[in-house]
């Protein structure tokens, strides 16, 4: 391959016994100098997916999250829906920013699945990720399915990040769920 299409796989990442010409699956991302780097490690999430990651550091440009690779993942301030602290677990989605870098966002609504396996009456666990006076409490069931405690039902004390025991009260045609904690 020409130099433009080459990607570095650091020698410590090369599996023992690998020979030139062997093929392998790698994950490619940009390092802090914007160079493409390959790794044989699997990150905790791929582009468009959601996952709960631990905040490893908070800096002046945002928070950094442990996502299973050597270089932590940036959660920019403008993608945070609330202030995060070191050591906290946060639900995020992975996206590609304007400069073609991988970043995290806490604005996960559009990344959550509407293909729920649950039916009315099922008991589920959900993580609060957003609270709206108009709509209610937005919850990610199993950290991946879209659900809502409608405003008329939302009577408890809710805060983003809190995990609730819920019951499915409705599954709409579009696959989104209404849930209740009553």
Predicted regions and their residues:
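Single-stranded RNA-binding regions, centering on S1/OB-family and related RNA-binding modules
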Residues: 1-182
